[in-house]
């Protein structure tokens, strides 16, 4: 029987161990998509308790606490940090097979030096150790980033954001990790939302463009894209129900926008037409500017209306949506390809059943750059051992796994960089298994290039950041 999470955790063969320890283990981290707060990086926040780090905004953990029958006051309510931590610790032993069990222990080992198991009985010991360590200067936000080997971070930012914290970080020569904005214009696209008109007023104000029709909206967006570019941005991200394609005449789009500006209801057909026009416009702009387009789709959000009214969005009440017409995604990309206007694109579906359809669609539009159109890493409800293995296996079956740009945290926590270790161990186990099974030669030079590429180097080349590859 193997020891729990020893140095060869998840490494099932001798080749897997060699690939991980020789090539993957010490590679830097390029975190090209996350939700951490740049203000906390600039201010070099020091957390008071492990609860603030772990449970302050982690809806992954909140879902499992609720699944374990924990009262909401210990999840998002007004109970003390110590009480919330106890509730989480008592939930942990039930999470056999869940990545949260692995991630939590990886974090305890890497950042706090704790080698035991977290449960209700050890909660006091772990609480005291973690809180003591968090007071050390080595445990500030910036030091956590540095000791994790991170070279660059892309946050997630709205077009109306001032990006003041990114500017301050860039001007601070005491911190050499690049922290760049990423453009997330969902609020400018969601014409069906009752908040759309108020958001358009905000966008008009910050852009200096009075938005009255689609042409002026495009002008306002271009104004803000130019500002984001001046701040180092070259990455966008979109959250879509699915990648739709419902083309419409400019006059139709103007009429739909006019309804949204006045707060009038728009039909589902009108919503899809407006969003199609919006996505085609921004995609063409991304291509012209050399930006990368990320699209996350396949999520049905805010399913528990009662809890949404109490807590708002992103609190643990989202699920996988099984409706994603692949034909429309292909038509969307085809519309861009007509005039060679497809930007580098990364497609993430929350539904693992979409792996093969993504794999076949991206193969229809590859050109010019290795892996120009990417299937994104297993995301959210899929970033566990099974999900990561299935995503990479599908990509290998249908495309060039060696060009894959690998893992991202997609997290709000400064301790989540262990997810890269988790991913790299799974990658090396998968590739090592193929080699040991005679499905790929034991060509260590080729394997080194593949593993280092997927862990880091491919993303350096793909995004074009001012970073050096690791040879």
Question: Where in the sequence are the language-model features?
Answer:
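Metal-cofactor-binding active-site regions of metalloenzymes
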Residues: 2-289, 341-343, 347-359, 363-471
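Metal/cofactor-centered catalytic core regions of large enzymes
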Residues: 270, 316-319
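C-terminal amphipathic alpha-helical interaction region
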Residues: 293-295
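Short glycine/proline- and charge-enriched loop/turn segments
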Residues: 308-316
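Divalent-cation-assisted or electrostatically stabilized phosphate/pyrophosphate-binding catalytic cores
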Residues: 323-329
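Short, basic/hydrophobic alpha-helical segments
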Residues: 332-338
